[in-house]
């Protein structure tokens, strides 16, 4: 199957799954919604939810990469479906155990967008929504770093910067995070000014960010 045909097939399948899951959630049919997601995982990713819940993302990634064809779309489907699973569980969960699904969704979106720059823009908001959901919780600094990089890939540069300064506040201006921030701004300085403006972080604000990091370093 040609790549564009495969992409369209995955997109159409995801559209139908989103529509059906949203309907089931609205009707409070959570078990049916979970089964729809599980069938989607088997069809689009080749794994069921039981396997995904047990395996680390590293192991899942190794399985997906074995076929070495159209992997970015499999990662995209994984991200979308894990985000849906988080949404289903969050509606009735009394704790935050469902956050693990959003963490897996983040991993999926990160891999998808890092491997394929031509993913349909309509999935950008799905990835952004996952980042926003995770930002509600106190998570590891490694997850924060991944959120920053995903925002950067999606050209949501203002959100990436917000994440950076959240990390600085969280770590009391840890030197390694300041260095991470300097690398972030230096990458942005290489972008066209129009791209920076589209990302809601104009060149002047990039320079302001560098100056602020230098101030925190005592330079």
Question: For the regions a protein language model found, what residue spans apply to each?
Answer:
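N-terminal alpha-helical interaction modules that lie
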Residues: 1-92, 99-115, 159-165, 171, ...
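"A position-specific structural signal for the A-helix of alpha-solenoid helical repeats
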Residues: 19, 77-84, 126-129, 133, ...
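Short alpha-helical linear motifs
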Residues: 57-62, 123-127, 185-188
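Structural signature of alpha-solenoid helical repeat junctions
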Residues: 70-73, 77, 97, 101, ...
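Alpha-helical adaptor scaffolds
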Residues: 107-155, 169
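Extended alpha-helical scaffolding segments
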Residues: 145-198
């Amino acid at each position: 199957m040609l790549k564009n045909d495969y992409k369209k097939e995955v997109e159409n399948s995801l559209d139908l799954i989103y529509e059906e899951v949203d309907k089931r959630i609205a009707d409070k049919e959570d078990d049916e919604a979970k089964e729809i997601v599980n069938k989607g995982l088997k069809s689009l990713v080749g794994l069921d939810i039981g396997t995904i819940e047990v395996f680390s993302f590293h192991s899942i990634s190794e399985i997906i990469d074995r076929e070495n064809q159209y992997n970015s779309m499999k990662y995209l489907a994984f991200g979308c479906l894990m985000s849906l699973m988080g949404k289903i569980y969050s509606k009735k969960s009394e704790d935050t155990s469902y956050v693990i699904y959003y963490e897996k969704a983040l991993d999926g979106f990160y891999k998808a967008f890092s491997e394929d720059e031509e993913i349909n823009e309509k999935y950008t908001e799905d990835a952004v929504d996952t980042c926003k959901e995770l930002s509600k919780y106190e998570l590891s600094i490694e997850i924060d770093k991944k959120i920053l990089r995903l925002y950067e890939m999606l050209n949501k540069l203002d959100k990436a910067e917000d994440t950076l300064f959240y990390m600085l506040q969280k770590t009391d201006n840890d030197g390694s995070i300041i260095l991470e921030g300097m690398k972030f701004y230096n990458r942005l300085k290489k972008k066209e000014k129009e791209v920076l403006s589209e990302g809601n972080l104009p060149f002047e604000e990039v320079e302001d960010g560098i100056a602020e990091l230098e101030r925190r370093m005592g330079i």
